[in-house]
Amino acid sequence: INIFMKKNCKCISFFIFFSIFFCRGREAEERGHANWLSATSGRKKRCPYTKFQTLELEKEFLFNMYLTRDRRLEIARLLSLTERQVKIWFQNRRMKMKKQNRAQNYP
């Protein structure tokens, strides 16, 4: 019973410690203060692509899996996206295709 109590106390202590610091991080974030626990504060909010943007990106991907920088800039301008968004979309799409091919080859 003593060993059981010690293990539980350690778990509970860790939980309390984590909860206190997590809550403090949340409070500071709500007040607008930077905190080491609020790593997401520097990230932009996720914005899903519109159906039109996705359709155009998919069409371009079917035509060419790899884009030149000029083409990437052109697509970004046409779809009102950043060059980085287009670049990452194509990277993610290539990985998706790779996973699909792997799943088909090894059912």
From Swiss-Prot:
One Pfam family this sequence matches: Homeodomain
Signal peptide: none
Organism in which the protein naturally occurs: Tripneustes gratilla
Main location: nucleus
Top-level taxonomic group: Eukaryota
Keywords: Developmental protein, DNA-binding, Homeobox, Nucleus
Protein name: Homeobox protein HB4
GO cellular component: nucleus
PANTHER family: HOMEOBOX PROTEIN ABDOMINAL-B (PTHR45874:SF4)
Family per similarity comment: Belongs to the Abd-B homeobox family.
Subcellular location: Nucleus
DNA-binding region: 42-101
GO MF term set: DNA-binding transcription factor activity, RNA polymerase II-specific; RNA polymerase II cis-regulatory region sequence-specific DNA binding
